[in-house]
Amino acid sequence: MGHFYFVRHGQTVWNVENKICGATDSPLTEHGRKQAAETGKNIVESGIKADEILYSPLSRAADTAKIISEMSGIPCREEPRLIEQNFGKWESTPRDGKEFKKAKESFACRYEGGESMLQLAQRIYNLLDELKQESGHKTYI
């Protein structure tokens, strides 16, 4: 079986503004681009060898992956199932809002207009299972 390294995208505009951005596209800040470059540098310096970088269709993930790819020489491709959880009506609202915190307590419940944590987990587990079956001993970031 291969290996998976998980990397989070760099800082986004909505991270700075303390907004929930889940499946909504929020671009990287300049600091986020620097974080992506630092991650790419760390991957190279650590000697991590990967066959492919997979990223979500959101620009913050795509830009992070492409910066890492440029620095490491590892090819990258978009994988739609890696899109972040859809928080539905909570997208663009404050992360620390009382109503959102209350809604998060219902782990298995779907956010109105979005998806539940369980739905997200199922989507990701299906992808990981598929990659393990298709790729044998490949390593992914």
Which residues make up each language-model segment?
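Active-site-adjacent alpha-helix immediately C-terminal to a catalytic or transition-state-stabilizing loop
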Residues: 4, 62-63, 70-73, 126-141
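Active-site-proximal alpha-helix that buttresses catalytic centers in soluble enzyme cores
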Residues: 2, 7, 11-74, 78, ...
